[in-house]
Amino acid sequence: MRPKSITRCEGNGMAENTEIRWEYDVVEVGQTGPKLTIEVTEELIATYAKAVRNPNPDYYPPESCELERLVKLAMPTMIFRVAPLRRPDIAANNGFTALEKASENPRQTPFSKCEVRWHAPIQSGDSITSFGHILSKEERRGNKFVTFRVEATNQNDEKVAEYDYTCVFEYGKGQNTRES
C-alpha cells in the first residue's frame, strides 16, 4: 500500500509532494534514526532532578567543596533525557513525516509500554550517544503496534542502557479512535 502524501500546488501551477506520512504499512523493522550525543553535566543532572521533583541532595550541587564527590551519578530515569526516543527523527531519516508532525490530520501514536535495561551508570562527564530504530511491528486484537529500541553508549563506547518503547500506530475497527 502506497503511503498517503500531501500534494500542494505552487504559484507556478506545478504540484509538489511535501510529505509522506509514516503510516503503519510503511514502517519497516530496521528503520533507524540519526545519532544524538548529549554531554552529561552536574548542572544537567540537577536540572533533571528538579524537573522530576526528586529531593535527593545527591543530585544537586554541593553546599560546600568538602561534600563534593568526584563524579555525580545520574538517576536511572535520566536515560529518557539523555537518550530520547525522537520518533519524528526516525521517520524523517527514512523519508517520512511522523504522524504527529503531519500538516494535515495529525494524530498521536499512543504509548503502550516501555521496558528499560541498564548496563552501566550514567554520570557527570559522560558523553551519551544514542540512536533509535524500529525493533518490531505486530498486530494484536486488530490493533497495530510498533516497538522502537533506543540504544545508548558512553564516550568509551560502553553500552549504558537500552529501552524498548511500544506505541499503538492504529486502533482496530470500532476501538478508540478520533472519530468515535
Outline where the language-model segments fall.
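Hot-dog-fold acyl-thioester-processing enzymes
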Residues: 15-111, 174-180
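HotDog/MaoC-like acyl-thioester-processing domains
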Residues: 13-28, 111-113, 117-180
